Amino acid sequence: NSSYRIISIGRGALGGDVYLGKSPNSDAPCPDGVFRYNSDVGPSGTPVRFIPLSGGIFEDQLLNIQFNIPTVKLCVSYTIWKVGNLNAYFRTMLLETGGTIGQADNSYFKIVKSSKIGYNLLSCPFTSIICLRCPEDQFCAKVGVVIQNGKRRLALVNENPLDVLFQEV
């Protein structure tokens, strides 16, 4: 299973790879936040692997995202992406780790073509539980960035989704 870095389209201060970091005010025993570096000059992002619900990895398909790094047993679940609870300060939900693979919960995402360049990430609940005949993307939300304590944190947004590319590691 290949690993990829999620890199942004922008350069300089508009750039920055996605990485696993410690969430402010978190009491989790392991890094538990999904962030983006403040510039494309500097460290590379944390590699991820995409785990499809079924079959291969394609656009517009439900999948889990896992940071693909060596870790101690205690921290294994802290590598799987999920959408956290509503954050009152940001009035949205932040991306964090602690998700599950293959479970009908808030750990599913999709990769879709951006309206500009590259791709966007969507957070999509496992909709067959909610509504059998609904269009699948009806409940999906775009992933973008909010600034948390000076760091760029991935979060659900209404506008300006993060445009990304994938670089095989």
From Swiss-Prot:
Molecular function (Gene Ontology), one example: aspartic-type endopeptidase inhibitor activity
CDD domains: beta-trefoil_STI_CPI-like
Protein family (similarity comment): Belongs to the protease inhibitor I3 (leguminous Kunitz-type inhibitor) family.
Domain of life per record: Eukaryota
Provenance organism: Solanum tuberosum (Potato)
Name this polypeptide is given: Aspartic protease inhibitor 6
Transmembrane segments: none
InterPro entries (UniProt xref): Kunitz_inhibitor_STI-like_sf (IPR011065), Prot_inh_Kunz-lg (IPR002160)
